Amino acid sequence: MRFIPLLAVVAATVIAAWLPQPLNAQSDDVFAFIPAGGRTLLASVVASHPPADEIKALASGKHTRDEWVSYLKDHAKTIPALQSLTDKELLTLADYLSFNMPLPANEMPADAAKLPMDGRDFALEKCEGCHVITVVVTQSRPKEHWLGTMHKPSHIGIKLTEAQREQLASYLVLNAGIPIDQVPEELRAGGASY
């Protein structure tokens, strides 16, 4: 009878090792060279404890990326965490918000890991599953080219909605094109591309 509880503990340990890492673990992983996605940026903004009405406005707003950029810049005094974002991070956050807001029930989840996935998440979950992530993140391509690749027969079977494909392509336009010397040696693909 001891065998079954021991087997359960071993199985739970193996399963836990395969579960997604928490948002704050991104800075500790081998993929830290890949810029933060909007989910991580939004989680850090929320974790800075801005006024409740500002959080509600973020969760319930529906804007284009450019409108979100203006909104975020206009609210940087009341949401101080926005002041520490680079222009690229602000644009990445605005892009994420344009795809994912308003949230259901117009409320920010208490657990930031329950926020919708961002482009970085999709790249690591969907692209890395078939080839080294370097193939993706070292390429600088326009959105139409990313979408063209995602609609090829070799990629169309990837389980992403059309909106998620758009979001992934948009994230890559903003954040890919990482110089190869910034990629850890063990992840270099030797110049591979699509």
Residue ranges and their predicted role:
Residues 45-53, 93, 123-134, 168:
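The canonical Cys-X-X-Cys-His
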Residues 60-61, 139-145:
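Short cysteine/histidine-rich zinc-coordinating motifs and their immediately flanking basic loops
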